[in-house]
């Protein structure tokens, strides 16, 4: 692994003063820079513009070389606003790609695309940096063994299990519990797998990034008193930033995650919110660089850009990066090139349902819409597969009967269908679960449920052994023993009331 010493300019590995160019043209976030003959920088080299604008304000803009134009000129994309830059300003070629801080010192901190801390907590205490552009791991380094990544969340582990080192698409609108689910996964990987997480906020709202940070501090995912005890590093490139920053912030987050995997040999969770904004930023940059657009106005290099990012997210013999990517679907059109290209890389999808959230069933993961390539008997075993299929069949039958129930009522159903409905309602409630990170809001302690316990619980409901228990006993509990204990308590309470 290539480690570069940090320098006075964060995000830049080495400053070679002798290789200087001058700005010849500025078009928004794109700069053309002329260099002396024979001193041309390489593609992806970081360029730094330092100086003063006409008002005497200090300027420090980092750019990345994207094209070599001929006549000793290069075209570069700025990672921050180009306000105040003028033609003729001096540009330093750093001789290397953008480098960002990596390692344990990044935990509990918020960074921008250049790896500069933006949380007002002082400089990052690390001398270890790593370039954001790297090759994907070689074939011989990959771990090809198929294994389940246990999350401790019943609905996910049973019906749409995650693959260790896989990629998961997270679909859901506003206010259905995406953030809480993300925070619970961060909490559980730290407790159950001894792993850490990196959150890449790509082109989303600054307010959402701030809310996430505040909620993480409140729930203990970020420990303000002792940052080293934190479980996550945050990298933000929000929607008000130039397209260059939004296009590269995903790579900055990935580089931090790769260090935890390759050097610390940990299991890492990498969250990308939102993968669509990564494509959108690439589309803007592509147009600014003068490339001919492809279908629906996207960049012609869409598949290559997506593949370059996704192929670095994988399991190696040292550790794994499991990635959970929020996917915005423009105009709900799944055939749009951006989501369609993303789907090709996903191993599982977790779909959050507003209907379930309205019923108060959290996590509001839709058990029928969520899918996983891991749910096969040869991978998860016959018992798990059979239980999952029977749960889905029961819920599907309940869904089909809901119209009849709404019009005619439960009494008009056959005995068999009434039993199916009763069990489906118990299953629906048993798929809910109290979260550790929601403890501070709800007051009920969080529960981590192992896969074996999850399967045992659903098998007991399906077998009919628990038909006599009230359905509210299954709501917001951990394993099945808690449900039976809750049923006993409810019975005692009702007797006392009488």
Swiss-Prot record:
Q: Which GO terms describe its biological process?
A: proton motive force-driven mitochondrial ATP synthesis
Subcellular location, in the record's words?
Answer: Plastid, Chloroplast thylakoid membrane
Indicate the secretion signal residues.
none
Keyword Thylakoid annotated = yes
Annotated membrane topology? Peripheral membrane protein
What PROSITE patterns does its record include? ATPASE_ALPHA_BETA (PS00152)
Sorted alphabetically, the Gene Ontology cellular component annotations on this record are: chloroplast thylakoid membrane; mitochondrion; proton-transporting ATP synthase complex
SS bond list: none
Q: What is its EC number?
A: 7.1.2.2
Q: Name one Pfam family in it.
A: ATP-synt_ab
Keywords on record: ATP synthesis, ATP-binding, CF(1), Chloroplast, Hydrogen ion transport, Ion transport, Membrane, Nucleotide-binding, Plastid, Thylakoid, Translocase, Transport
Which amino acid positions bind ATP, per UniProt? 172-179
Q: Extract the InterPro entries matched here.
A: AAA+_ATPase (IPR003593), ATP-synt_VA_C (IPR055190), ATP_synth_F1_bsu (IPR005722), ATPase_a/bsu_AS (IPR020003), ATPase_alpha/beta_chains (IPR050053), ATPase_F1/V1/A1_a/bsu_N (IPR004100), ATPase_F1/V1/A1_a/bsu_N_sf (IPR036121), ATPase_F1/V1/A1_a/bsu_nucl-bd (IPR000194)
> What broad class of enzyme is this?
translocase
Q: Which NCBIfam families does this UniProt record tie to the protein?
A: atpD (TIGR01039)
What this protein is reported to do is described as: Produces ATP from ADP in the presence of a proton gradient across the membrane. The catalytic sites are hosted primarily by the beta subunits.
Summarize the subunit comment.
Answer: F-type ATPases have 2 components, CF(1) - the catalytic core - and CF(0) - the membrane proton channel. CF(1) has five subunits: alpha(3), beta(3), gamma(1), delta(1), epsilon(1). CF(0) has four main subunits: a(1), b(1), b'(1) and c(9-12).
What name has this protein been given in UniProt? ATP synthase subunit beta, chloroplastic
**Gene name in the database record:** atpB
């Amino acid at each position: 692994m290539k480690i570069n010493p940090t320098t006075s300019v964060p995000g830049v590995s080495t400053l070679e003063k002798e290789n200087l160019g001058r700005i010849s043209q500025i078009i928004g976030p794109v700069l053309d820079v002329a260099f002396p003959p024979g001193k041309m920088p390489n593609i992806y080299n970081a360029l730094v513009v330092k100086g003063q604008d006409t008002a005497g304000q200090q300027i420090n803009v980092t750019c990345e070389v994207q094209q070599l134009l001929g006549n000793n000129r290069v075209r570069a994309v700025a990672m921050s606003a180009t306000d105040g830059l003028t033609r003729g300003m001096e540009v330093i070629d750093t001789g290397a790609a953008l480098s960002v801080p990596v390692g344990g010192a990044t935990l509990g901190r918020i960074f921008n695309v250049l790896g500069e801390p933006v949380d007002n907590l002082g400089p990052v205490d690390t001398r270890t940096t790593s370039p954001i552009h790297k090759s994907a791991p070689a074939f011989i380094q990959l771990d090809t063994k198929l294994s389940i990544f246990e999350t401790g969340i019943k609905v996910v582990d049973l019906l749409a299990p995650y693959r260790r080192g896989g990629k998961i698409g997270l679909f859901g609108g506003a206010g259905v519990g995406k953030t809480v689910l993300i925070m619970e996964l961060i909490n559980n990987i730290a407790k159950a797998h001894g792993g850490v997480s990196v959150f890449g906020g790509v082109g989303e709202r600054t307010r959402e990034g701030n809310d996430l940070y505040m909620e993480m501090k409140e729930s203990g995912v970020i420990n303000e008193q002792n940052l080293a005890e934190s479980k996550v590093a945050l990298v933000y490139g929000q929607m008000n930033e130039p397209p260059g920053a939004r296009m590269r912030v995903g790579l900055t987050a990935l580089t931090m995650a790769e260090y935890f995997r390759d050097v610390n040999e940990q299991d890492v969770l990498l969250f990308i919110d939102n993968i669509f904004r990564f494509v959108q930023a690439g589309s803007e940059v592509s147009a600014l660089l003068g490339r001919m657009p492809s279908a629906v106005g996207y960049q012609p290099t869409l598949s290559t850009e997506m593949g370059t990012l996704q192929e670095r997210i994988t399991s190696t013999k040292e550790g794994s990066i499991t990635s959970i990517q929020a996917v915005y679907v423009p105009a709900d059109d799944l055939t749009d090139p951006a989501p369609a290209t993303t789907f090709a890389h996903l191993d599982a999808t977790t779909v959050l349902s507003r209907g379930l959230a309205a019923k108060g069933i959290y996590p509001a993961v839709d058990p029928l819409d969520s899918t996983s390539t891991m749910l096969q008997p040869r991978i998860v075993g016959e018992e798990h597969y059979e239980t999952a299929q029977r749960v889905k069949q029961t819920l599907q039958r309940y869904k089909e009967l809901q119209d009849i129930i709404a019009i005619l009522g439960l009494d008009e159903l056959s005995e068999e269908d009434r039993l199916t409905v009763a069990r489906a309602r118990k299953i629906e409630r048993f798929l809910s679960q109290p979260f550790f990170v929601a403890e501070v809001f709800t007051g009920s302690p969080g529960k981590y449920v192992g896969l074996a316990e999850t399967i045992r619980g659903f098998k007991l409901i399906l077998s009919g052994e628990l038909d006599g228990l009230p359905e509210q006993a299954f709501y917001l509990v951990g394993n099945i023993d808690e449900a039976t204990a809750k049923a006993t308590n409810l019975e005692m309470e009702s007797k006392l009331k009488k």
